[in-house]
Amino acid sequence: MAVAPNGRRLLRIEARNAQTPIEAKPRWIRTTATMGPEFRDMKKRVKGAGLHTVCQEAGCPNIHECWEDREATFLIGGDTCSRRCDFCDIKSGRPEPLDEDEPRRVAENVREIGLRYSTITGVTRDDLPDEGAWLYAEVVRQIHKLNPNTGVENLTPDFSGKPDLLQTVFEARPEVFAHNLETVPRIFKRIRPAFRYERSLDVIRQARDFGLVTKSNLILGMGETVDEVKSAMRDLRDAGCDILTVTQYLRPSNLHHPIERWVKPEEFVMYRDYGHDIGFAGVMAGPLVRSSYRAGRLYAQAIKARGEELPANLQHLGEGIDDTASQEASTLLSKYGASRETPVGAR
């Protein structure tokens, strides 16, 4: 019987994944830590108040850039997800009871850090009657109440696609409602067995119909083809998705889905251009782009592309929106030059 380091019996899919060693990364997957004044101030505030962000706890490679923009991400609902996706490092199982004071604490953390834009994400809570809908909505309400000049992006699970639960979340009116599709139909069931491709598209559609700015993410390198990625992008756009991020899959451990290929920066540039061609208001694509990467700036870019004005209380998000982010594929091409094909191999 195969077991994990903590003594837990491995799932069959984990045992199969573990047969493939962790892969060596290509040269373009790297970051440079630049500690500017805003980053240093945020780090001091976070440490002084004993606060915790996903940015730190997940060891995000983009923390220096996002914190310099006064942006951060918070994980809500506990540290245990009621579903398991084959790419995700969050543990799955039966979650702890809901902490109803969490929304207030998160809002106070946002105020203490002095964020300009905050992303809220969290685990799936199928164990709760409302699947956590109240929690996701209440965090947005509390942040807006205590931080009227802070934008909020709400990255949520699908709430089983139930209109009444989604309505609860929509009515909190985040600046951006995000739900990540993540992959293409052919491999969706293996990668996200507890989710449904069409249901995720319908979540985006319902948010669009409510009048929210919508966002999603695609992870590449798990076995999809170029044509399948383009088709998924069209599906998202047809569902009413406004903003899209496209990223490279990085394997959290050998128990997770093996990396099928390293997507070159040139291909990410192609997806960015294709996304704009088919009508996305904002597209960010690159190997180390993540769904919350430079989220405030991407929101501001999307509002501008739609020919709209940022709300008066969020005008500050429009500063420097035309600058290229360091993890965008076009920046990597300028820095490293054309990419050679890099086969996937053990490190």
Curated annotation (Swiss-Prot):
Residue intervals of the Radical SAM core domain: 67-281
PROSITE patterns: RADICAL_SAM
Swiss-Prot/TrEMBL cofactor(s): [4Fe-4S] cluster
Native species: Corynebacterium kroppenstedtii (strain DSM 44385 / JCM 11950 / CIP 105744 / CCUG 35717)
Reactions catalysed: [[Fe-S] cluster scaffold protein carrying a second [4Fe-4S](2+) cluster] + N(6)-octanoyl-L-lysyl-[protein] + 2 oxidized [2Fe-2S]-[ferredoxin] + 2 S-adenosyl-L-methionine + 4 H(+) = [[Fe-S] cluster scaffold protein] + N(6)-[(R)-dihydrolipoyl]-L-lysyl-[protein] + 4 Fe(3+) + 2 hydrogen sulfide + 2 5'-deoxyadenosine + 2 L-methionine + 2 reduced [2Fe-2S]-[ferredoxin]
Gene name per UniProt: lipA
GO cellular component, one term: cytoplasm
Protein known as: Lipoyl synthase
Source species, domain of life: Bacteria
EC code: 2.8.1.8
Compartments, record wording: Cytoplasm
One Pfam entry name: Radical_SAM
GO molecular function: 4 iron, 4 sulfur cluster binding; lipoate synthase activity; metal ion binding
Pathway(s) of this molecule: Protein modification; protein lipoylation via endogenous pathway; protein N(6)-(lipoyl)lysine from octanoyl-[acyl-carrier-protein]: step 2/2
Protein family membership: Belongs to the radical SAM superfamily. Lipoyl synthase family.
UniProt-annotated binding residues for [4Fe-4S] cluster 2: C81, C85, C88
Keyword annotations of the record: 4Fe-4S, Cytoplasm, Iron, Iron-sulfur, Metal-binding, S-adenosyl-L-methionine, Transferase
Cofactor binding: number and manner: Binds 2 [4Fe-4S] clusters per subunit. One cluster is coordinated with 3 cysteines and an exchangeable S-adenosyl-L-methionine.
